[in-house]
Amino acid sequence: TLSTGLIGCNNEKKQQQTTTQVETTENKVKNNIEFKSDGEPVKDDSVLGKNTYVFSPTDNKDEIQEKVSQIFARQESNQFGDERYALLFKPGDYGTSLEINVGFYTQVLGLGILPTDTNINKLWVNADWMFHNATCNFWRSAENFSVNDYCMWANSQAVSLRRVNFNDGIVLSDGEGWSSGGFMADCKVEKMVSSGSQQQYLFRNNNWGYFENGVWNMVF
């Protein structure tokens, strides 16, 4: 009985500690996102990690573009680097000029409840740095927002598109260059999905206008 009682006390103490930790973390996240982090890295990197940027529709669009472009310039060919970036966008419309090029080790994420809550003009991944060979484009993702313009997402493995609405079409390779593998889930594409040279692609629970150019190993 004594042993059981001690276990019960310990469990209660652990539960109280866990509850306190959760509340503290929630407050940190709330304070960082609401008051400190628009267009700059989140100050307390113990919450969301280093190099986390939270943007708002009220931020200067040119400054957002400048920051996004600076990050891409670092990460476009940085396949063996140790930098990691997260670009978080609060709900709203980011205008008709913002273009997000996504490099290595970069996540782009909309913070709305629905993908339609956050609207970004253009999402783009090419393989210019490797002479259009996208088989070396790894380690990046995009989730939970809408894209107005036509999209190139030329990657190969260790990449994902989740809950993205494309108001135009999307191509999954860069011209005649090679590409091999990827994952798309819960996405809506109003027009065409062109797989191009892609192979070994997994598609789950998507809605498209139509699909073109399957090579092999496509799983739907």
Q: What kind of region is each of these model predictions?
A:
Residues K90, L109-L111, N121, F145-N148, ...:
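Feature marks extracellular polysaccharide-active and adherence modules
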Residues Y53, P57-Q107, I113-T116, L123-V125:
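N-terminal extracellular ligand-recognition/capping segment immediately after the signal peptide
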Residues N27, N31-E40, V47-K50, L161, ...:
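Predominantly polar beta-repeat domains that present long G/T/S/D/N-rich surfaces used to bind, process
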Residues L109, H132-Y150, Q157-F166:
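Parallel beta-helix/beta-solenoid
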Residues E63-F80, Y94-G103, N133, Y150-A158, ...:
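Short, T/G/N/S-enriched strand-turn elements that build extracellular solenoid repeat scaffolds
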Residues G5-G8:
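C-terminal motif of bacterial Sec signal peptides marking the signal peptidase cleavage site
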Residues N10-E12:
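Bacterial signal peptide processing site
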Residues D59, D93-Y94, G112, W124, ...:
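Residues at the loop-to-beta-strand transition
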